[in-house]
Amino acid sequence: MAQPGMGLTLNGIAQGYLTDRIVDILRANGCDRVLADMGRSEIRLVGHRPDGQAWRIGLADPLSPAQVAVTLDLADRCISTSGGYGTKFEATGRHHHLFDTTTGTSAGHYIAVSVVAASTMVADALSTSLYVTPPERAGRLLAAFPDAAVLVTRPDGSRHELSEGGKF
């Protein structure tokens, strides 16, 4: 790295990829019901709960993390949430690890982006990509992932589904 203290993280895709690989190993060894949670931001759900119902997942409110903002019932799907609240460079949180692709500064379009997809790697990469992409360019990015469901939380706390189909 160019300066002391600089670092590089592959969390924008690595956790999702590893989650998928771990679940592949579990499935290859006979596990047909799996809830794989890799640190609260990437979750892969295989099959249904033992009672036959879909897995119930609660998404924390990024403005009040002890509160559940949205509850989803999912089976054979994956979810990833990206937000600037994870790794902060200073106490206010204005400067964090997710950079706007057009300005090179910490992205501030949203405070959280959650994506439901068939692959955890796709959900992980897409949630991070959408978080750092200016909103006016999000539609073009989403067009390549028609099966993904996307929920964004804006800085004022309002939530909006970017994807079609009402999966949130």
Regions found by a protein language model. Name each.
Residues 1-168:
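Mature catalytic core of soluble alpha/beta enzymes
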